[in-house]
Structure formats: structure tokens, C-alpha cells
Amino acid sequence: MEMFASKSLQVEGLLFGVCSPEEILATSVVEVTKSCLKAETGSVYDPRMGSAGVDDDDALCPTCENTGRECPGHFGHIELAKPVVLFYKETVAWLKRCCHVCGTVGNEPRPFFFAPYSACNACGAQRPLVRLVDAHDPCAIRVTVRRKDGEPETMPPELILATLDRVRDSDVDRVLGRGKGSHVRFHPRRLVMTRMPVLPPCCRPNARQWPDGAMQDDNLSVFVSQIVKVNQRIKALEPDNPAVEGLVAQLRLKTLCFVDNTKGKVMHATNRKPMAGIKERIGKKGGLLRQNIMGKRRNQTGRSVVGPDGTLEVDEVGVPEAIADNLTVPVMVTPFNVSSLEAMMRDGRVSSVEMRDGTVHRPSEWRPSHGDHMETADGSPLGRVTRPSYDARDPSVVLRSWKTGETVTRPPPFSWPKLEPGMTVTRCLVDGDPVALNRQPTLHRNSMLGMRVKRLPGKTIRLNLSVTSGFNMDFDGDEGNLYLPQGPQARSETMLLMNPKSVIMSARGPHAEVSLVQDGVLGCHLMSLNSEIPCPPEELATCLMEVHGCEGWDVRDVEKGATPRDLLSSVLPSTLTVDCGGGCRIESGKIVSGHLTKSAVKKIVRAVCLENGGDAAGKLVDKLQFLTNAWLSHRPFSVGYSDCLTERPEETVRMVADAVCSKILEAEAADDEDGVSVALCGARDRGQAVTCAALTPDNRMAVMSRAQSKGDMFNLTQIAGLLGQQYVGGSRPGKEIDGGRRSLPHYPRVWDLEQTTLKYESRGFVRSSFLKGLNPREVFFHAKSGREGMISTSQMTGVTGYAERKMVKLNEDLVSAYDGTVRDAMGNVVQFVYGGHGMDPQRCWSDGCPVNFKTLAEECSSQECSSQISGLRSPAVTSVEEASLLVPVGLCPGAPDPVRESLFLKHASVILKGAEEHPCEDHSAWRERVARSYAAAVLCPGEAVGVLCAQSIGAKQTQQTLDTFHKAGVWLDDAGSVPFGELLGLSQKPMRRQCVVPLKVDPSTPGDEVRDLVGCSFVRRDLLDLLAVRPSTATVGKTASLELDPVKCFELRISPADVAYAVAEKFPPPHFDVSVSSFGVTLSWSVNYPVDNLFTGLFSVQVGGTPGVESYRLLRGRDGGWVAVTKGTNLGAFLCHPLADWERVRTDDVWDVYETLGLAAAKKRLYELMFSCVGDNLYPAHIKLLTDRMMRRGRPTPIDRYTMRTCEVGPLSRAAFEESLDILTGAGCTAETEHCAGAGARVAAGLPVRAGTGYMGLLCGKGFFDEPVVKVPDADGREYVDYSYSDDESFEW
């Protein structure tokens, strides 16, 4: 949004409806009666409807007398020879709702569909059965009615129009529920079209073909031409002509396909391709809403390949000079910049100058015509003009027109006006201009950042490596987009809000998004290791100059003979004290122990950002980057073939082989497939430990792995140790050939005792390394498992991207309000307290706690007190009441009082706990710091928390999917896109439905005895699944024997008596007489009793105690007790089971929890399941907001297109997601009003979104805009205007 007011009017709302024939005629300027595709009167391109071509932009419109560029276009109309039904579903709904004789609608406030064959309360007429037949075929779609004891009859559009015309306006107002007068915008008679509007030609412009430049008519123009042609043919025929029926069918087909041709019923006459109707133009990714309204192409943009540049600062972007000279920005002339602008004007870097009266001066290049004659001043010929731009440069050359022979007069040379304050100069980019850098796909906030321009030679866009993680750039040909903001407000927001220093802290999780990578991390690691050998003087001077430059530095900070670790410590803030983990600790800006890694550097940047702000963190990243670059230039580091070798290769190979053999023996002794997988995974882990221990300390690949700059120990193990077990689909490669007996034809069917290693190789165990080389069979298994990661990367990225888009569209209106609540566009409360704490997670050390109490206690204690025993210190606060005084009083004022009391108690408990665990000496300073930190961490009003939630979760899902590509052969866990997609959709039949049931049995009890105790009470199976052979109906003896499968029945502890009881309960005598045999059940029945039908339902008899559970596994829990993991869920049954520990029973089915325990329990369980999928390194506030959004309506609501259709926002916001035409049609048929409250609707209407800087408003008093009359003399005697109000003035809003 620009700072200055626009001359155009703002859209306040949109009224949807269906036009009546009278309204169509009133807005029409011409009746289209000719089917020719030429600019003729009455044709499809009648000039009175506006311009349609690309070459007549300067022609005047006969209707509005504007040029082709300014003419908005004017509608025409077609008088249809026969009525046409466009919206069949809505038409059938109204036919079911009203009486077909008198048109009366029921008296209910929201009438339902009357029962067919019932009598009308007004006239007593019978209501017929109305059906829509062949709804998906536009050639055969029709409405049928059936009277009682009659046959279905097709209801023609003429009869439909007559029936719906009887509906009274008052009934329409009552049915729509939009208040009195709604029938003005919609009446059911308008569902049958008798007069068709014709779009202006500017809405269906001609397209120029390439390469011949011929004009091609738009599909909609061809549709209109065909409709007009058929319509005129019908009018020309007599009503009783036999050809009329076929032409009417064509007219209705082409009219329907004009709106919706997704079935491709109407095709081009030349290329036989389906033509695009209105629905195809509006919906999908390339439609009008998403391609041209929600997102638009714009000027002042650039695109090029992106590359790294370690000399740039974090917030700088290197722009190629060719792009910088092409992009322009308007600048207001002031006394302070007039000299610099005049210099740019002389250098040719100004494109235009706008005077204060609005006149624009722009240089235009004059060129002679191609073929003009060139002569010297004395008349000597020089030939003809072949290169107009080059030949016009010499002013001494005389030009004569090749047409008339007359001398061509050159225009006078262009001269710029003298610059004065108030003018606007459009200049090229200079260093320091703000520009937005973006890389698609824009998954989260850090995919588009505001940078400072730095003009550089070359043709690639360059940026600092520290910001590449947010863009997900790997410089393998990635391209970046540059967007140049034009207005002063847009430039300020780009410079301040979008700056990388303002978004160093990730909006996704508690880590720094902008930090060192690769060479920078490696340099920090190596420098932190070197704490004894001093730097040479040249190296020391180079590093200090690179970091501090000409600003200078205090020589006392870096002593003579400083080591690389001292150099690294000199860059850190002197007040920094942080425990980086892994034995690395920094105290008072000095590295006192350990060494730096990538995670340690991120923790340092995060600590500096939280304590000193984003600017300080950005400067720290710059200094670390420049310091490591300079230091590595003196200490080269490269990896070679020798780094792939261990210190003693033969011994390493032997030790790895021994480890593999021992684990293979464990796999042989395993009872099930899970035990085999655990043993084989242990072989890879043992091989990794052996390989890493055999590497030399200075091995460069190991150094990079320990520094976390590139690679890890897993890669080293695959290179020098072994690849280990390969997995496909979460399990070992199966035996897929030779009837399921072999995995490859190279392996035998039966294994000898000496072929144990080969046996596991046939199931994908690779004991070779890349250094040794894989045999062809191992290569096959490795490629087979690696394919899974590749396919997952290529296919699941689209799945996760669509999931993110669904979350964004349904949560884009969720914004934090000024009262601390989270509300949607309609003002409905989604959360009373954001995240349960009301704090901005990016400003907190932990979830909802913005204070690092340990560091704060050290800072608020003297050095003498710190060195003494901790008993000399005392807690700064001693009670909850005292701690609650440090919480901001205005925290979440819109929440109910009980919620606020709980919130204050929660924060006070955290403060009290921090004070007790970390006592200090200066209590007043401690309290002041805590109060200031809490006040600064309160969530800002207008924060788009819904979009942040969706982007954070979506980016995390996408990153998890991309990571699978780099883990070829590893057992990929299923806590990823598929389960999370099921949670978003709240599938009632998820792929994995299980219950975890802890058992109340002695942990020392053997597993078989536990199964005996449980019996078949945990399962219920169909009788057919338990049979060894399916019997047929006996014809002799009237008996049947059901033979049970002993393996299945023993595993489930289902006895023949249980089967007999279940059969007898469903089919008691005289149906069957049931008796138990050795391991089966015998059925007998009466001789004259028919049992053929009974046998059909016999095999569906349920045997067991818990419906919905097929089987279960017994596992050991973390506490050593027995846990039953079931396949299938029935939470209610397990909560009541005497052997189940009901307090710890868990199920993965959210709907089962909702139906058993209610909404609160389902919400908590949904949060736990989502946290297990994506909660790692993610702010819990995002998941809490998403679960609250899904549970806000009082029942679980999925995140999908059906929920979007029932949202309370306007139809335009809903149509911007999916099913655009259906939603807009429904809005018109229900006379909805779009108030432009949702984010999507405001973007489509050209309004600022109510979030961020567009969230606040301005309240002014009545006299605010009055001319000030009070003049007060200043100290020098000059008068100035006093804009303040006096105390006795009345101030009214």
C-alpha cells in the first residue's frame, strides 16, 4: 500500500447475484446477431463493445469515447430462441422446494426439500419426485419429474421457467435469509436464461500467433460465434420443423460448455482440441483468480542465476550492472540529493523527470527510416541506412527520405530540465537501494528477504552464504527474483521488516535461520581447536584488517602472539556467556572450553540475537564470515583420496567383518523380522564405530563431519566401512521371483549352513563399502532402496506443497488482535492466548519464557560473589504474588478473567522457579531485566500467526521429504508426509490405526502366559479369516464342518469353543446346532430347513471380544512392563478392560478419542500426534494454533476443500482456493455479499491485507483536519503553528 492516497475508489464490498433479463438488457449496448468474427455491426466484435485487437489501442470507442487502453469494455447480449438452464443443481433444489402448481414455499425459516408425493399446504397439489439425470454429461443432462403411479418425464426448460416464475418474492427473501429485498439480486426464475450476456472483447482479446504474427480468436469468442450461429438458425426455422429439436440441443450444449467445458465436449474445428470455457479460465493455478488477480506480473523486476559471494554482508545482494541499469526507482528531489541526482543525470542513469505540475520529461531516441539515403554535407552519397541506431549517431550526415527524397529533419538534442525540490526523478539502482530477493517456491518467510543493492560486474545475482538456508539455494543453477519496491512506504518496509537482520531468528523453531555454513563453520571449528600456536604476524594483520577494516580496533583486545582461538574470541561480544553443548562453553566473550561446530555457532548467533538484537547478530555473522575467509586463505583445507583411507585399512576391514559376523549370528537367533532388522541395523552401527575409530585425528573428512560443515559419520562409514542393510518400503527387500522363494535368480532356493552371509545378502545386506566396491547384486539392492528416496523426493514434495497451501488458505486470516487474542477475519476468537503464553516465540529462550535466568543471575552478581559459595546469593523474588508483578499488566486483556489468572500464574511460576534455581545479588537489576524482557516479548498486534503456522509446518514437512534423498538405503520412518496428511484431513479410516494398551500384569510373566491371560478379549475377527478351508453347503447329511486355522487361532488365542459360541449367538436353534470337534466346529440343521441364505452370512460372524481390532503384538515398554499394540482401535473397550492400565491407554485415531472422551481429549491427542510428526525443532505454538483451528467449531474439522467451502469468510476468499466457479455460482444463487474481510478477498479487490503494517487504523477527532489558527513565537521571535489542542477544547470522535 502506498503512503499517499490513490485517485481511484476503494472497494468496500461485492454483491453477488444472478442477472435478470432486464438487467442484461440494461447493461447491453448491442444485440449480437451475426456470427462472423469481424469488427462489424451486430457481430461478435461489434465496435460498440470496445476494442479487441492489439493494434487498435489508440482507436476511440463509440460508446464511451475512450481509447482502447482506457475503455473498460461494454457488454452485449443475445436473445435466445429457446430458454437454457445453466445451473442445474440449483434449479433442481428449487424445484424440490416449491410447489409446481402455485409456487408456494414452506413456512419454515430454512425450508428443506419437501418429501415427494406430499400435498402442498396452500393448494393441495401433489409434489412430484424431481431428479437430476446424467449430471456429468452436458449432452444428456436433464431434469425429470415423476408423479405418483406415473412414469418419469423430462421437464423442459420452458416448463421449469414457468414453474419457478410462480415463486413469490417474499418466499425468496425468506429462503435466502439475507433480509428483505434479496430477491432483487436473485430469483429462481433467473436460473433459466432467456437472454445471454456477451462479454466485452477486452475480456476475450485476440492473441497474436508466433512466428507469422497472425491473429487468433479467443476460445470464448468462438463459443459466442457458434451460439449466435445456432441461435439464428433456430429463429429462421418454423417451430414445427423437425430440425429445431436438434438445433435446440446444440444451443443448450454450446451454452453449457461456454460456462464449463471440462468434459471437452466442444472442440476446435481445426486442431480438434477442447476449447476453454469460463470455468477453465477462472479455476486452477493458471486461472484468472490465482494467476492474474491473486498474483500478478509486474514491472521493475529482474531474474538471473544466483551465486555465492563471501565478500558481501548478510543484508547485501550483488546485482549485475545490466539489471541495475534496467531497474528504476522514483526519487523525490530535495536540497540534500539534488547534486547527486544531477550527476546521475549527466551520466545517463536517469530515465525520466516528473515536474511538479505532473509533466514528464523522458528522452526518446530518434532513428531514421530503414532505407533512407545518406549524404555528406557537400552532397556526396554515403549509401543507404541499414542500421538506423548506428547510422543516426553522426550529426554531420545528411539524410533524405527514400519515399519523397526530401531532407529528413533531425529533432533538436534532448536536454534535461533543471532540477528543483519537489520534482520526481526516476533513476537507476545505486548501492544501498532496498530490493526484495525471492526464490521460488516461497515456502516460508525467509524465502523472500529485503536486501541492500551492491552493483557488481557479471551476470549473476550474488549473496552471502549465511542467508542461503532460508532460500534453500544450493547454487546448482538456482535462479532468484528481484523485486524493486517503488513507494516510500514499501521501500521502508523492505529495508526494515524484511531485512535479514530482522529475521535472524527462525519463525519455525528455536534456532537461528541466518548463520554460517560450510567454509565459515569449518573455519570456526579449526580456529577454535588451535589454542596454543600463535598466528604469524602477516596472518594476524590480514585477519584483523578483514574483520575491522579501517575502523580500527583496540590493540588490547588482541594481544601480541594471539592464537586463532583468541582471534575468534575477539569477534564475540564481551558480555556473551552461553553453553553451546558438546563441551563448548563461552564466558564473557571468550571460548573457555570445547570447540565450535555448526550447532554451536547457531546457538551463539541465537544468544546474541536474543540479548543484543538482530543488528548485533548480523554484524557478528559478518565478522565471523570475513574472519574465517581470511584465516582459511592462509590455511588451505582440501579433501583428497587419502582422507577416505583409515590408518590401518587391513585391520579395519577385519574388525568390520568381525562386527558384521557377530550381528549376523544375532539375526539368526532372532525370533521375528523385527529382531532381524534390529540386529542388522546394529551391524551398521558397529561398523560405523569401528570405521570412525580407525580414522586419524587429522583426517579432513572426519574434521568436516565433526565440524558439521559437510557430511557426517554415516557418509564416512559408507565410504570406508560398509553400507549395511538396505530397506525398501520400511522392510528388507522381499522374495519377489520364483513363486516368492528368491529375491534374485543368483541365489539358491535352499541355504546351506556355510551360506549364512550370502543368505542375508539376498535380502539386501551390503557388507561392502564404496571404497572396496560393490558386487552387481549389492549394487542392485542399493539402487532399489535409493530409488525409494528419489521417488519420495520427487513425488512427495508436491504432496507437502499442497498440504502447506491448504493450511495457508484456511489460516491466512488468523491474526493477533490488540487484546491479545487470535481472531479470524470475521472477528471470531480462535485462541484467547496465543500459544498458551501470549509471547512471541522468536523472542523467547524456551517456550513462553523470554529470560535466560542462568545468564541473568551471573550478570546481576558481582565477580567476588560469583567466585564464592552460592549461599551468599538469594532469590530475587520469593513468592508467586511478587513474581506476577513482573508480568506485563496488559498481557492478553481480551481473554476471560479465569484464563488471564491462569496465564499470570503460569508466568509467575516460571519466574519464581528461575529465581529460586539461579539466585543473584542485585535484586533490583534482576527484576528490571525480567520485566523488560517480558514486556518486549509480548506478541505484537497484527502478527499473521496463521500464515506463520502454516508456513512453518509446511516448510518442516518439505524439508523432511527432501532429506530422504540423502539417506539412500536407510530405514525411512513413516512419521512424515503421509501420517501428517491423514491428520490434516482427519481421516476416519487412516492407514495405521493402533492402540497402545499397557497391561496390568507382572513384568516377569512370560509373553505366552500374558497372551493366555488376555485370551481373545483384545481382538475380533471374521469367521472366514479363521478358517483353514472355506466349506461349501452340504447336500448330504445336512451337516458342515468348519476347520479352523491352528496357527492363526493360537496366535489370537481363539478356541473352537469361542467360535461355537459366536455362531450359536448369531444363529441359534433351529438355524444351527453347533458342536465342538477336535479343532473345528460342526454345524447341523433340520432336514427341511433352508440354509443356503444362512451360509452367506455365516462367514461374517465376528469372533472375539473387542470389535474393530484385528490383532495385537506384545512389546516391552520403557519401564519394562508388557504393552499390547493393536492393529485397529476401540478406545472405549480398552478403557473398560480389567487387564488394561486405562490411564496410559493411547490411540492414533482422533475420531475414536472424540467419540469416546469428547472434544478436549481429541484436541489434546491431535496435538500429541502432530507433535510426534513435525514437532521436532518446531515451536509448539504453531501446532497449538493449528489444532485450535481444527477444533474451533465444536467437533474435529479437517483442513481440506470441503472445510474451505463452509468457512465464514466471503465467497471471493473461498473461491481463491479451489472449486472457484462452483463457489461463485453458489454465492450468486444465494445472494451473498463479500465484505472484503478475508485476506484473499482483499488481495483480489486491491486492498491492503489486515495484517502487519496494514492492521492498524487511524482515529481522528472532528477538528483534526481544521486549519490551525494558533501561532506561537519561538525563542528567536519567529512564529510557528501550534497544532496541539488546548485543555478546554472538547474532543469528540
Curated annotation (Swiss-Prot):
Q: Name one GO molecular function term.
A: DNA binding
Where's the DNA-binding part? 270-339
Q: Where is this region: Bridging helix?
A: 776-788
EC number of this enzyme: 2.7.7.6
Q: Which Gene3D superfamilies match?
A: 1.10.132.30, 1.10.150.390, 2.40.40.20, 6.10.250.2940, 6.20.50.80, RNA polymerase ii, RNA polymerase II, clamp domain, RNA polymerase Rpb1, domain 3
Q: The organism's lineage? A: Viruses, Varidnaviria, Bamfordvirae, Nucleocytoviricota, Megaviricetes
Residue ranges, compositional bias (Basic and acidic residues): 354-376
GO annotation, cellular component aspect:
DNA-directed RNA polymerase complex
Q: Which InterPro entries match?
A: DNA-dir_RpoC_beta_prime, RNA_pol_asu, RNA_pol_N, RNA_pol_Rpb1_1, RNA_pol_Rpb1_3, RNA_pol_Rpb1_3_sf, RNA_pol_Rpb1_4, RNA_pol_Rpb1_5
Which residues are Zn(2+) 2-binding? C99, C102, C123
Q: Which reaction does it catalyse?
A: RNA(n) + a ribonucleoside 5'-triphosphate = RNA(n+1) + diphosphate
Listed binding positions for Mg(2+) 2 are D474, D476
- What's the source species for this entry? Frog virus 3 (isolate Goorha)
**What are the alphabetically sorted keywords of the record?**
DNA-binding, DNA-directed RNA polymerase, Magnesium, Metal-binding, Nucleotidyltransferase, Transcription, Transferase, Zinc
- The protein depicted here goes by the name Putative DNA-directed RNA polymerase 008R
Residues that bind Zn(2+) 1: C61, C64, C71, H74
User: Which family, according to the similarity comment?
Assistant: Belongs to the RNA polymerase beta' chain family.
Which PANTHER family does this entry report, sorted A to Z? DNA-DIRECTED RNA POLYMERASE (PTHR19376), DNA-DIRECTED RNA POLYMERASE II SUBUNIT RPB1 (PTHR19376:SF37)
GO biological process terms, semicolon-separated: DNA-templated transcription
